[in-house]
Amino acid sequence: MKLSPQRIERVLLIVNPASRRGRRIRPKALKAFSDAGVDCEVILTEAPGHAAVIAKTHAHKYDAVFTLGGDGTVMEVLSALAHQGPPVGVLAGGTANVVARTLRIPLNPARAVPLLLAGDQATMDLGRLGDGRRFAIGVGVGLDATMISEAPHRLKKRFGFMAYVLGGYKAVLRNQKFHLRLTVDGVVYERRASAILVANFGAVLNNLVAFGDGIVHDDGLLNACVFSPDSLWDAMRILWRMLRKDFGADPCLFYKSGREFRIETIPPMIAQADGELLPDTPLSVSVDPLAGCLLIPRRGRTE
């Protein structure tokens, strides 16, 4: 569901100063708000969890809340403002910037700020973890979480997102399989898998990579996508399907939609939500229908 926003005149910018990129681009973001004639108040986070406290305490005073940090900062603010508060605008201040890339928000704040201020308000489902935290894009177990965990820190500092490409390459070559016990709305499915994604969005990376057909973010459902390649050839075929958005019958792909999910694995596997690492499985996930309101570029204006 998209709603045309009212004029945004006053915003709160929550900045994570631990984000190296966020520190570097903050002056550009502030200039973009100033050039747009928007009053912007900045509050810096001081510890993990502080962004949620800031949002809960101050959001009601503003027309919109913007985040400038990593995907963890976005998760905190979305969790704090679920079903309430003003819309959230995401500025890419981290390394992976999964949410910004998926929403097709430019990484340059000089472009992102005016596009979001003149864009749409999108009311969408959010995913909810067992501890109450929300996510916008999806939860992954296995290959994608390993890709994030194995990206070398020194390369992330130097090369940013490209460090994850190296982590992904290493994870694909290893192709660590696990026994998956997936419960969807009370029904149990068991498979051997290399990765499972519980997705709210059907495509990521500026719509470059898709997970499956019919995955939308405002239908009150999440979508489990299980990937089970037996060889490097299988993995390459799946990747080609994801790039072409061609999801015909494939023995290495398995899909189930639902509202409540339980992921159990043998052995325990690392997990991630919107690019942020989580404790190892088991993991519980559910949908929170139409819980989030985000600012997105108006279609056709991301360039």
Q: What are these model-predicted stretches?
A:
Residues 1-65, 301-303:
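ATP/NTP phosphate-donor binding region
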Residues 155-162, 204-207, 213-233:
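Gly/Ser/Thr-rich active-site loops/lids in small-molecule metabolic enzymes
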Residues 45, 184, 216, 226-303:
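ATP/nucleoside-binding phosphotransfer catalytic cores, i.e., glycine-rich phosphate-binding loops
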Residues 73-84:
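Short Gly/Thr/Asp-enriched flexible loops that form oxyanion-binding sites at enzyme active sites
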Residues 67-72:
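N-terminal glycine-rich "phosphate-gripper" loop used for MgATP/nucleotide binding
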Residues 176-178, 192-194, 218-223, 257-261:
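A generic structural signal for short beta-strands and their flanking turns/coil linkers
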Residues 140, 197-213, 277:
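Glycine-rich phosphate/pyrophosphate-binding beta-alpha loops
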Residues 5, 14, 24, 32, ...:
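Catalytic core of DAGKc-family lipid kinases
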